[in-house]
């Protein structure tokens, strides 16, 4: 199973101090150094989200990681003309289409692929024409998986936030939803990834309950752990946990 490391919150920390002076010589922490550390720790890919409001990752961050880090790059992005143009300039290995709300702290739910199907189709076609694979970040619901299949998405990322944020019976119900969605996607020939809220504590339950997972995209818990053990070691611990449990 592959581990994609999301390094957005390295940029979040940097922006807390240097948002208005990114050209300063002493800006820290370095997004590029975090990507290198993730690579040394065993990451299989780097994920970053360039949001429309540029609240954390900047265009220059994505471009520097793409140019310098020898790992596949996954760009999370909203389906806007601006971001489509940027993705075509960046040429990541793949993109993950996500919803965006300016008032949210982080992405709060999956993209409604059913509602936005007509808007997504031309974007996905443009990306395919440029050799960029497209994933859709969706809630684990049958209609969403079916919409992804109609759009010809080669992969999806199941939103695991509800699983992560609940316990007891509600978490069991979320696991069942994830399992059904993963099984359906697999039967339709769609690669199944997962992300949002996955941490060192809930990883075992997720992997035991959801089949056919190909890649996990994990960020906040790794960056949080890195505050105490360093980025490379935090990634290594997650890599070892995935290898042990999968």
Curated annotation (Swiss-Prot):
Keywords: Cytoplasm, Pyridoxine biosynthesis, Transferase. It holds the Pfam family PdxJ. 3-amino-2-oxopropyl phosphate binds at residues 6, 17, 197, 219-220. Its main location: cytoplasm. InterPro entries: Aldolase_TIM, PyrdxlP_synth_PdxJ, Pyridoxine-5'_phos_synth. GO terms for molecular function: pyridoxine 5'-phosphate synthase activity. 1-deoxy-D-xylulose 5-phosphate binds at residues 8-9, 51, 56, 106. HAMAP family: PdxJ. Belongs to the PNP synthase family. This is Pyridoxine 5'-phosphate synthase. It comes from Akkermansia muciniphila (strain ATCC BAA-835 / DSM 22959 / JCM 33894 / BCRC 81048 / CCUG 64013 / CIP 107961 / Muc). The lineage of its organism: Bacteria, Pseudomonadati, Verrucomicrobiota, Verrucomicrobiia, Verrucomicrobiales.
